Design a protein with these regions (language model features):
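A short, polar/proline- and glycine-enriched secondary-structure boundary/capping micro-motif
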Residues: 21, 61-69
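Short, conserved "active-site rim" segments that organize catalytic pockets and cofactor/ligand binding
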Residues: 1-58
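Basic/polar, cationic surfaces and motifs that engage anionic cell-wall
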Residues: 1-9, 13, 70, 79-161
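Charged, often glycine-rich, active-site loop that binds/positions anionic groups
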Residues: 52-64, 131-140
Length: 161
């Protein structure tokens, strides 16, 4: 049975732009953290190479709760400035290459096609943070993390229309 998917969550690896971080690195780090290989469905390298790490029908642990059950996780390599420190939020920036930007759109469209018209939201991991003040908007002060280091909601809004 095909699972219901209504959201796509965009992630970054929170790794420095000047350091290569491969799918093998993701697998190693996710094995250590979760006891399983890559918990994203799609992983995109700096050169734009798209890796299908998991079948879209598999629930993976990329965000939390309903975002995992009803979401597809797409991750790009990067998110931290060259020579930056992943522990410093000021070093979290949009490091996407032109190739990654193109591949992200390809991967999102592929995920949407697989879902069969049920996707209603494309957002960043940070946009799944709790709305602590209850105003209906996840604001920067409420972000649990900076990921994906750019504002995914307006970036991909046109894909939902």
């Amino acid at each position: 049975m095909k699972r219901f998917v209504d959201r796509i969550i965009i992630h970054c690896t929170a790794t420095r732009a000047d350091v290569d971080y491969t799918l093998e690195n993701v697998n190693r780090d996710h094995q250590a953290a979760f006891g399983k290989n890559c918990q994203y469905h799609v992983f995109i390298r700096k050169d734009g190479t798209i890796h299908r790490a998991n079948d879209f029908n598999v629930v993976t642990w990329h965000t939390g709760g309903i975002n995992n059950r009803q979401g597809i996780g797409i991750c790009y390599e990067g998110g931290i400035m060259a020579k930056g420190n992943p522990a410093n939020p000021k070093d979290a920036i949009d490091t996407r290459t032109p190739q990654q930007k193109e591949s992200l759109i390809v991967a999102i469209k592929e995920a949407m096609a697989w879902a069969g018209g049920t996707v209603k939201a494309i957002k960043g991991h940070r946009d799944t943070s709790p709305d602590k003040n209850g105003n209906g908007t996840i604001e920067p002060a409420e972000w649990v993390k900076m990921c994906p280091c750019f504002d995914a909601i307006p970036e991909y809004k046109h894909l939902l229309q």
